[in-house]
Amino acid sequence: MASQWTIPKLVTWRVRDWASCFLACKIPLDGDEDGANNNGNTTNNNNLTFKRIKRKIKSTKKKRSERKLSLSPPGTRHHHLHLRSSSVSPTTSGSQHRRLSWPQPPVSEESGFIVFCFDREDGGFDVVKEGKQEKKETESSSEKSPRTVNRKLIYGDQGVGGTEKNNSPETKGTEQDQNDNTSCQGTKDVSSDVTERTKEEEDIDASDKSSGSSHSDEGRGSFAFPILGVEWMGSPAKMPESDDLSPKKQKPVALGFQCCRF
């Protein structure tokens, strides 16, 4: 039985067959394009999923490394950070190299400078300071020379100190005067010491001559009293005393002593 839809179906089939005769590649090409589009969509989806998986893996690795660093002792953290810094991508290192290789501004030639001269035999050193103003002065007057400062190191008990001395005739004259004064004071002190020593020696000689007693050592067995003209053996308990030591006023004294031997 024929229905109302059979006629249009037959018409459509006949049109397709007729078109397929003239355009044999048209229909399969449409089908291939649809398949290629489907395949492209699937590949894009696969790429997106693969990228997402990569990102997740990287994030998990970073989290694990951070946990290890937090749990590791402080001595090893520096080592891990050094390894991370060494494993920087070459692109970043190239950019840093480019930044470093940029042309730097030239140093101004008008800036001042200091020159140290250590060729002195006194142990000191000269300091030459030159700046913009001094350069202008030297250009204006060639006779003027840069300021020189002599600094001499003095090593004392408390520490090391530096004394600044300007090379001028006034300072040299004052230094010579000070040295002369110190030398004069030293000679005066030495002469006074010598005179005091000679006076002490003269006093000792006078006392020895007046007493006339010769002090013997303990190891010897006898000693003498020249005033009394008596020689004892051993050491007496008490020294005899004489009233007048002058030879004119001496009176003959007769005393009897007993010799004692120990």
Swiss-Prot record:
**Biological function:** Regulates asymmetric cell division (ACD), especially in stomatal-lineage cells, probably by modulating accumulation and subcellular polarization of POLAR and SPCH. Mediates an attenuation of MAPK signaling upon polarization of POLAR and ASK7/BIN2 in stomatal lineage ground cells (SLGCs) undergoing ACD, and relieves BIN2 inhibition of SPCH in the nucleus. When phosphorylated, functions as a scaffold and recruits the MAPKKK YODA, MPK3 and MPK6 to spatially reorganize the MAPK signaling pathway at the cortex of cells undergoing ACD.
Q: Where is the major localization of this protein?
A: cytoplasm
Q: What is the effect of changing S145D?
A: In BASL_123456D; phosphomimetic, increased interaction with YDA and promoted polarization
The record's region (Disordered) falls at: 32-107, 129-222
**Subcellular location, in the record's words?**
Cytoplasm; Nucleus; Cytoplasm, Cell cortex; Cell membrane
Q: Where is the composition biased (Low complexity)?
A: 37-47, 84-95
How is this protein situated with respect to the membrane? Answer: Peripheral membrane protein
* Protein name as annotated: Protein BREAKING OF ASYMMETRY IN THE STOMATAL LINEAGE
- Show the ranges annotated as biased composition (Basic and acidic residues): 129-146, 190-200
* KO phenotype (gene knockout): Clustered stomatal pattern distribution in seedlings characterized by excessive numbers of small epidermal cells, due to impaired meristemoid mother cell (MMC) asymmetric division. Abnormal non-polarized subcellular localization of POLAR and YDA in asymmetric dividing cells.
Q: Describe, from its UniProt entry, the tissues in which this protein is expressed.
A: Mostly expressed in stomatal lineage cells including asymmetrically dividing meristemoid mother cells (MMCs) and meristemoids, and, at lower levels, in their sisters. Also present in vasculature. Expressed at low levels in the epidermal pavement cells.
One annotated GO biological process: unidimensional cell growth
What GO cellular component entries does it have? cell cortex; extrinsic component of plasma membrane; nucleus
Q: Where is this region: Required for polarization at the cell cortex?
A: 222-262
* Consequence of changing S89A: Reduced ASK7-mediated phosphorylation. Abrogated MPK3/MPK6-mediated phosphorylation and abnormal nuclear retention associated with impaired cortical polar accumulation. Reduced interaction with YDA and fails to induce polarization
Q: What positions does the record give for the motif labelled Nuclear localization signal 1? A: 50-57
Summarize the impact of S235D.
In BASL_123456D; phosphomimetic, increased interaction with YDA and promoted polarization
Q: List modified residues, type Phosphoserine.
A: S72, S85, S86, S87, S89, S145, S168, S235, S246
Task: Name the residue ranges with Basic residues bias.
Answer: 51-66
Q: Which residues carry this modification: Phosphothreonine?
A: T91
Task: Show where the record puts the motif FxFP, required for cortical polarity formation.
Answer: 223-226
Q: Which gene encodes it?
A: BASL
Residue ranges with Polar residues bias: 179-189
Keywords, A to Z?
Cell cycle, Cell division, Cell membrane, Cytoplasm, Membrane, Nucleus, Phosphoprotein
Top-level lineage group: Eukaryota
Motif Nuclear localization signal 2: positions: 61-68
